[in-house]
């Protein structure tokens, strides 16, 4: 049996920009992608702490060190600059893998710098 387990999480990312006319996705600072293990173009689940919106899209790379968390395309309607997001990916684990699996959790400061990495 396969179990869907949390693979990575960016906790309390702050929306820094939104571009309704961009073709879609969520731009994330490359440093945050690397720290969390989220890959460019990977499906992400996004939970807006401020308004309760929940949606899925895909991650694209933003400039390293920029703190970019930018809603693009239709997702730009799902939050406002300054809102806090939880960004999550999931992976399938077999029965043999599930007990040893640990997600990468990156806790963020309000300026999208890394506060702590929990593994």
Swiss-Prot record:
> Which Gene3D superfamilies did the record assign?
2.40.40.20
Cofactor section: pyruvate
Q: Which GO terms describe its biological process?
A: alanine biosynthetic process; pantothenate biosynthetic process
Q: Supply the name of the protein.
A: Aspartate 1-decarboxylase
Q: What is its EC number?
A: 4.1.1.11
Q: How is it modified after translation?
A: Is synthesized initially as an inactive proenzyme, which is activated by self-cleavage at a specific serine bond to produce a beta-subunit with a hydroxyl group at its C-terminus and an alpha-subunit with a pyruvoyl group at its N-terminus.
> What's any one GO cellular component for it?
cytosol
Q: Enumerate the active-site residues.
A: 25 (schiff-base intermediate with substrate), 58 (proton donor)
* UniProt organism field: Desulfotalea psychrophila (strain LSv54 / DSM 12343)
The gene for this chain is panD
Tell me its family: Belongs to the PanD family.
Q: Which cysteines are joined by disulfide bonds?
A: none
The UniProt GO MF terms for this protein read:
aspartate 1-decarboxylase activity
**Cofactor binding summary note:** Binds 1 pyruvoyl group covalently per subunit.
Q: Which Pfam families match?
A: Asp_decarbox (PF02261)
Q: What class of enzyme is it?
A: lyase
- Superkingdom of origin organism: Bacteria
Where is substrate annotated to bind?
Answer: 57, 73-75
Location relative to the cell = Cytoplasm
Q: Which residues carry this modification: Pyruvic acid (Ser)?
A: 25
Q: Which InterPro entries match?
A: Asp_de-COase-like_dom_sf, Asp_decarbox
Quick one: which pathway?
Cofactor biosynthesis; (R)-pantothenate biosynthesis; beta-alanine from L-aspartate: step 1/1
Q: What is its main location?
A: cytoplasm
Q: Which UniProt keyword terms apply here?
A: Autocatalytic cleavage, Cytoplasm, Decarboxylase, Lyase, Pantothenate biosynthesis, Pyruvate, Schiff base, Zymogen
- Give the reactions, separated by semicolons, that this protein catalyses: L-aspartate + H(+) = beta-alanine + CO2
């Amino acid at each position: 049996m396969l179990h869907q387990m949390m693979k990575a999480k960016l906790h309390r990312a702050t929306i820094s920009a939104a571009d309704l006319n961009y073709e879609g996705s969520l731009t994330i600072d490359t440093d945050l992608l690397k720290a969390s293990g989220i890959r460019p173009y990977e499906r992400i689940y996004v939970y807006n702490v401020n308004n309760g919106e929940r949606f899925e899209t895909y991650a694209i790379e933003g400039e390293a060190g920029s703190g970019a968390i930018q809603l693009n395309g239709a997702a730009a309607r799902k939050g406002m600059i300054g809102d806090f997001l939880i960004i999550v990916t999931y992976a399938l684990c077999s029965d043999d893998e599930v007990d040893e699996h640990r997600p990468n959790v990156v806790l963020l400061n309000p300026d999208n710098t890394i506060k702590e990495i929990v593994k």
